[in-house]
Amino acid sequence: MSYLRYYNMLDDFSAGAGVLDKDLFTEEQQQSFMPKDGGMMQNDYGGMNDYLGIFKNNDVRTLLGLILFVLALYSPPLISILMIFISSFLLPLTSLVITYCLVTQMYRGGNGNTVGMSIVCIVAAVIIMAINVFTNSQIFNIISYIILFILFFAYVMNIERQDYRRSINVTIPEQYTCNKPYTAGNKVDVDIPTFNSLNTDDY
C-alpha cells in the first residue's frame, strides 16, 4: 500500500487545496501590498483614462508656471500682469512677485518710485511666506494674496509710466541738430540805405 494512503501532507497546512485567495490574507494585508486596477493609482493622480490627472503632478505644473513667468519677464508691463496672474494658479504668487521684482530691477533699473515699490512688494511677499509657515488659514491666504497682487499691480504700473516717459524723452541724433552759435542781429554784410543817407540835392 502506498504511504500516501495513510499520510496526507495537505493535512499539516491550514490552507490547502480549494482555499481562495481572499482567505489567505486579511483585508489590511491586502491593502498594504497587493496592487489594484492593474497597478494604476486613481486616488491622487488619476488612472489610465483620466488624462486630466497629469496636471496634478508637480513637475507639469511647475513647467507651465515657469514658461508663463519667462514670457511675463519679456512682455510689456500690462501683459506681464496677466501672465503673472495665470502663473499664480500654478506656482506660489509670493515667489513669482519676489523673482519678478528682482529681475526687473536688475535689467530695467528705475527711479525712486519703482525701487521703493519693488522693496515693498518683496517685503510683503516675505512676510506672507513667513506667516504661512505658522498658520494654514485659507482666509488669510486669500486676503494676503489680494493685497500682494494690488501692490504688484501698482509696481507694474510705475514701470509702465517710466517706460512711457522714456519713450517721450527721446534724444535727437547729433547729425540732425544745429550746433552752430547764433546771435541775434543783422546777418547781412551789405549796407542797407536809410532815409537820411539819400542825397536829395541832385533833384
UniProtKB/Swiss-Prot annotation:
Keyword set includes DNA-binding: yes
Entry-linked InterPro entries: Poxvirus_OPG144
Modified residue annotations for Phosphotyrosine: Y203
Organism: Vaccinia virus (strain Western Reserve) (VACV)
Swiss-Prot/TrEMBL site (Cleavage) positions: G16, A17, G185, N186
Membrane-spanning intervals of the chain: 66-86, 139-159
Family stated for the protein in its record: Belongs to the orthopoxvirus OPG144 family.
A Gene Ontology BP annotation from the UniProt entry: DNA-templated transcription termination
Membrane topology per record: Multi-pass membrane protein
Chain intervals for the UniProt region annotation (Binding to OPG125 scaffold protein): 1-38
A cellular component term, taken from the record's GO annotations: virion membrane
Cellular localisation: Virion membrane
Protein name: Virion membrane protein OPG144 precursor
Gene assigned in the entry: OPG144
